[in-house]
Amino acid sequence: MIKICFYCDSIFSVGGVQRILAVIAGAISAKHEVTILTLDKPEQEDLNMYELGQRNIRFRHISLPPIGKWEYLPCKTYSYLYKKRIIPQIPITSQWYGYSSFPHTQRKVLIGELNNENYDIIVGVHAFLSLQLASIRHRLKARRVVGWMHTSFNAFFNTPGFYLYEQKNQFRHEMTKLDGIIVLTNYDRELYERELNLFPIAIYNPLSLTPEGEGSPAYKRFLSVGRMSHLTKGFDILIEAFAIFARDNKEWTLEIVGEGPEKPALLKQIARHKLENRVTISPFTRQIQKHYASASVYIL
């Protein structure tokens, strides 16, 4: 039996990454010893989410300590110089940037937690935690340490001001320290190979829901689901498209299920187009299957 650890920022909250992690970890736990190490606080633990309580998964909580100002200031200064290319973004400076963005005080805690449990495989869930693991790979006992990407290449590296836009070279240099990288599509795999000279494997997300009911064109309803952030879904573009479509298709409606920082702007956009009676924003729910079953078209 292999001991596998998934290191994530959150599992006890609502989101697509959390749901996929729960499904994958649950399936693997049937034959192996699986631990999810999360930055969630212990009081956030809710085993009803994603049916986690029905799986043979162990949960551990880790709290990375705050950084004192005498450690924070030099790290912050170096990070600024690196990201603005005032210093060259070569392998050694990229390694130092990895240390400056994940200071020694926090690295020490994570190394101790992971090594004390003697895992065979450690998986960093998403880019930033994978980069943390890359910076300490040489100190970890695990046989394999893997980074699992949950956002597209273009969102990571080609979105100014967000994600890894100023860290492309750091990612290129640091991720070679890991024993593997997982991406979600073959299209992204090809981009990593061509632009970063990294060679990930592509593993598509599994079906994470059991279908209940059946949608029908007769409902004349579009459905889209996800976090309300321009970087991840682009619901603003969807609303603009629906506003055009709605001019000549009076019976159709649009429902968006989700929450996030873009919600107030989306509500204003809906009001600007006078679509309050045709576009609905619903909160995240654990009963999302009912929304799928009442829709005609799902917009990804």
Locations of regions flagged by a protein language model:
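A conserved mid-protein helix/loop that constitutes part of the nucleotide-sugar donor-binding site
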Residues: G15-V23, S229-I244, P261-L267
